[in-house]
Structures are given as structure tokens and as C-alpha cells.
Amino acid sequence: MGLICGLAIASGLTVTIPSEAQTISVNEFFPPVNRYQLGASNLGNGVNQVTSVAELRDVQPSDWAFAALQSLVERYGCLVGYPDRTYRGDAEGTLRARPLSRYEFAAGLNACLNTIEQLLQENVSVAQGDLDLLKKLAQDFQAELKQLAVRVDNLETRTAFLEDHQFSVTTKLYGQTITSLDKVFGDRVGGGSNEFQTQFAYRVRFNLETSFTGKDLFRTRLQFSNFLNGVEQTGTNMTRFNYDDNSNNNVEVSHLWYRTPLTDNLTLRLGTVGVGYTDLVDTLTPPTIADDALGIPSRFGEYDPVYRRGGGGAGFNWQITPTVQLSVGYLATNPNDPDPGNGLFNGGYHTLAQLAYQTADGGIGFTYSRSYFPAGNTDLMAGTGSLLAIQPFGEVIATAGNFYTLQGYYRITPHVQIHGWGGFVEAQAQGGGLSNLSNGVGGTVLRDVSWNSSAIWYGLVGISFPDVGGEGNLPGIALGIPPTVTASNLPGAVGQTTPYHLEAFYRIQLNDNISITPGFWVVLNPEANSNNATQYVGHIRTSFLF
């Protein structure tokens, strides 16, 4: 005993209503608005249709269709715009107080179609008279419903395009402040009392990080500081900190750098000032270690000295596979100086190529770099190691160096990680003449340099323990040999013995923004000479990140 009602909505759609359950299959009732598509059957019948005048005029509040739709809105809440689930339009209590265009009316009708469809899905009873009313309205506004579907599809396509391509240029400010209480103990290199007084100094950085596309990064860094490196007081660079910058409290643009992907696997990095290899490639050292504010405090212990190059230039990173990356870079020491012997290509420069393998737990890489320093500007080891390793042929002789280095790290467990690096440098004098070389005990010795060469070795191993003693904490130790000249064909230009660097530190993370790092390191045989007193360096570093 079933009652079968044929309800045609749009083109030949029928709805079957079983009388026992008084429910209607949604798919058998009416399709969503996106089914109203123009098809060949509508256009290919060979008969030119003449549009009725009634199909062109607006729907007036006095029209039966207007009243019919308003009754559906009131009974089923098709158009809900206010907290009390009513739609008030231009006059409270009405669908609209003014005439509606046929497309406005079709939009309201479509809303009621969707609402009643939802009710049928939930097995809610719908009056037969209302179904008949919907049938009549859908037939009268079939053309507008079809066009509405097309317009909605076009709007969705345009919206998706805007979501994929629209990006608002965003700049974020990041701040970092380091304060440190430092003291060096032990007689000065070469004898005499150590004049390094207890130092309490600071360094402040503000990074303005901007993205133009959502995938690139442009960084501008403002920095001011008042640290002194203490070399004059101790007689060696082996006691230096990695944050001992000094701008005499003047604000300066210390870093200008840009990174952008060129393809899915190729990235360009470039900058004009304060750019180092650390901005072009990965140092293959745990990020918790290679960080001025949060990592190991000594200059030598932070990362391989091969990366301590600065100036302006560019680099490319090619991600060959998800774990293998090839990087190349070029830096000029004074790219902004147009004087002879300077500039981007006619002064001091550094080139680098690095092949690295990295996974989530660690990585290893081989790095080759060549550096050239004009006469009067030699700093081969970038302020680390012995003075003889920094200037193996003295300051007045132009010097080149070929670096062959290996770096790696591995996270054994979530709370144990190891790292290390080692390097060999082939130093070459780029000319000749009389030059004063460091004698390793605080003085110099005069030598006649003539295209000589020297060998420099260095290395370090370390172990650290992330989150041991508290979340964010980092205790660690390191043992290394600072850069030292081990062989030379220039008489008197070799270190007398091997220096050693032993360091321990413990970063205590007070909260997300503040940490305190007490620690110390010991330098045995500073300046590669056993006649020098052992240097003891102590510090308490406090870092603020915001």
C-alpha cells in the first residue's frame, strides 16, 4: 500500500514517497544545484526558443512566487542570518521589502532546496504541499538555477586561485640580547701578568625578517654591542668568545641577506653585508651547539672554522635527493669597496663547495674552500687558533689557503648527541719579502718569505645532552686541537707543540625566552708553545630571546 507521487523538479526528476514511512530518498527527490548544467540535449533540438516576457522581469512582492518562497522560508528557516534564526532582509519580518531580480530569487530558492534536502536526509517529515510548491518554483526558475550553478562554480575557481596565489608581504621582528660576565686566568702568553679584568658586556640584535611570497626570506639585522675580544690582554685568540662583537655601542646594519627557492630542488642565498658561510650552507653541527646565544660559548668550539668567512656574495643549494645536498658559495671580503684590490672580484674572496648527507638524526659532509687575502689583511683562520695559523707568513704577505674539512653529528638518543669536525689547510704565500711572523711566545721573528707553503691542522669532538636536568637545558663538553701550523718550508714558521682545548658548559633554560649558561674552558699550550701558561676562561652568559 504505497503512495507513489511523481514530483518533477528541473528536467524530468521524479520522487517516490513510500506511504508507510513517509520518507523520501534524497537522490530521488532533487539534485544539488551543481547538477543544473547546460547540456547538448538542451541546445541541439533545432528549435529556436523565444524567452517569455515573464522570465525577464523581477519578482515582485505581490507575485505568487514571492509569497510561496517566503512561506517556505518562514516554515523551514531556509535563509538564516540572525541569532534568532530569522532572515529579515530590508524590512524586519519579510524576505525582502523590494522586488528581487530573478537571480536573487533563484539564490533564495536554491537555499530552500538545500535545506529541505537536509531535512529529508534526517528523515524529517515534509508536507506534500510544500514539495508540490518546490516543484512548481523549480520549473519556473529552471534557467536561473542552471546559471546560478555555473556562476558558483566560476566563483569557487576564482576563489581557489586567489587562495593559491595571494600573499600579503609580512615582516616579523625578532630580538636577541646576550650579556656575559667573563674572566680569564693565567699568565699572559709570553710571560707577564694577565691583564684581562672581569668583563661584563652585552650584544643586542634585532632581526627584521620579511617574506614576499611566503617561500622566501629577507633578513635585515640591526646590532650594537660593546664586547672586547681580550686578545691584547691574553696574547692569544684561543680565549675568544663567539659573541665578542664590538660596535662601540653604535647601531649598525650587520647583516643583509635573502633566500629564495628557484625550483623545487634549488635555492639561492645572497647578501651584501655580514654574510658568512653559515648563511649559505649547513655547518653540520647540532643547532643547539652552533648558536651564539644558546650553544657552546667559545669561538673555536662553536663550529668548524672553515665557515667563519664574512662579507657579501651568494650561494646555491641543490637538493639532489631528500638526504643529499650539494652547495656552492662565493663571498667577497669587501664587495662594497671600489678601490683597487677590493670590490666583488678584485680583492679578498672565499669560494666553497660542500657535499652533505643528512637525515633526521644526523649528518656528515665534506667541504672544500679556497680563500685569498691581499697583503695587509691576512686572517686565514678567522680569529681562531694560533697567531701563526692566522698569519702563517705574516701580515704583509698576501696569502691563499685551500681547506679540506670533514664535519658530522649524530643524535644517539633524544638526550645524547655527538658532533665533531677536522680540517687540513694548505697555506700558500702569494709573493715574497721580509715579514714578521709570530714566534708563539708573544713576540715576532723576521723571515724572508718567497712563495712558501705551510700545513695547518685542527679538529674537535663534543658530546651534549639535550633536555637533561630540565626541558630546554643543555650540558655539554668538548675536546679539540685549535688550528696549528704543523709543517712549513719556511724556517721558524711551525708551532712548537700541540695546543689543546677542553670545554664544559651547562645551559639552564629558565623559560621560553631566558637562559643562563655558566661554563669554562682550558687552553693547554696556548699558541702551540709549551712555554706559555695555561689559560683558564670562565663565563656566565645570559640570553634573552623575544
Curated annotation (Swiss-Prot):
Can you cite an annotated GO cellular component?
membrane
Domain SLH, which positions? 52-123
Name the PROSITE patterns for this protein: SLH
- Kindly list the GO molecular function terms attached to this UniProt entry: porin activity
**According to the lineage, what is the superkingdom?**
Bacteria
Sorted alphabetically, the Gene Ontology BP terms of this entry are: carbohydrate transport
Q: What InterPro entries does this protein map onto?
A: Carb-sel_porin_OprB, Cell_Envelope_Struct_Comp, OprB_sf, Por_som-like, SLH_dom
Homology family: Belongs to the OprB family.
PANTHER family listed in its UniProt record = OUTER MEMBRANE PROTEIN ALPHA (PTHR43308:SF1), OUTER MEMBRANE PROTEIN ALPHA-RELATED (PTHR43308)
Q: What is this protein called?
A: Uncharacterized protein sll0772
Instruction: Write down the species.
Output: Synechocystis sp. (strain ATCC 27184 / PCC 6803 / Kazusa)
